[in-house]
């Protein structure tokens, strides 16, 4: 059975901040944000926008844009780390707003930024094992990344939701049922206690945890593959990653390349040029949406996927890798195959018009919202 993504859509806040403006306000060289982090803008959620409203709007877009009947949804899962209640899931509010059927299996998943990918895997397995009986799964990644004013994490904020419909009619992308690697380890790289409205993060440590998890998940995936050589980097036309900030994808791809090559490669290495070229061809091209929106936690990998699908054709995109990471930590590496002809859905996928219609906030307006 072919199972994967039938439809996908993004919805974000109506306002944003220019990172160059934020840098000047904080007395920082703008290059630190725009080149060091690779970020251009960050979406800012107002008090009228929360995880629920972002999720509902993304869900409405994916159903409307792809002409999917809400009564065909048999499972609804929201992956988030910025829920609105310690007990009641965001998903049940979305269920009500969309008017989904009463026997729709509905719940929320949480594992930092890995929550939505966990939901995608669950939906994929639900359909693959025959329990769906023709129904589809609606998976939504919805989050608001927020840090205190002046905090080192401030320029890595963002907000938004990505909604996906998983079904046995994967018009956009099919998941490889054989290759799915996992990695889990208890680490304190990022957390948000119940008493705090903002997160705590050890940035440098978290980068190391991310890269260790990438290696663990990739090695596990290859160990499970009957023919691991089929998943070598040279056979991948695109490699997309969890993107807390755009430059993290460069670090991730570098490590991915090293594991594939079975050698460490630094800036003095003869193969360093190959690493940079590989990143440019397989990853960097699909980071413009992340750079314009910021960190949306559970949805950041899928925002990069939207960028990939809107800017590619099935002639030059046959096999891709997808790495998901959630602090704390959990990670997965999976392989997927874009469906031939997926480009006919480009207009339904592309959020460019919405992003261009956003209103720029002054720093004082932004600080008042915070």
List the predicted regions and their residue ranges:
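Acidic, glycine-rich active-site loops and adjacent beta-strand->loop/helix elements
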Residues: 9-11, 79-85, 111-116, 141-146, ...
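Catalytic phosphate/nucleotide-handling subdomain of diverse soluble enzymes
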Residues: 306-356
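Conserved catalytic cysteine-centered active-site region
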Residues: 32-36, 40-52, 81-136, 142, ...
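Conserved beta-ketoacyl condensing-enzyme motif
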Residues: 5, 51-117, 228-257
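Short, well-ordered amphipathic alpha-helical segments that serve as non-catalytic structural scaffolds
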Residues: 29, 51-66, 90, 209-226, ...
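Condensing-enzyme catalytic core mediating Claisen C-C bond formation in acyl metabolism
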Residues: 1-48, 151-219, 335-370
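Hard-cation-handling environments
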Residues: 241, 259-262, 274-282, 307-317
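A conserved active-site cap/scaffold subdomain adjacent to cofactor or substrate pockets
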Residues: 204-258, 289-290, 294
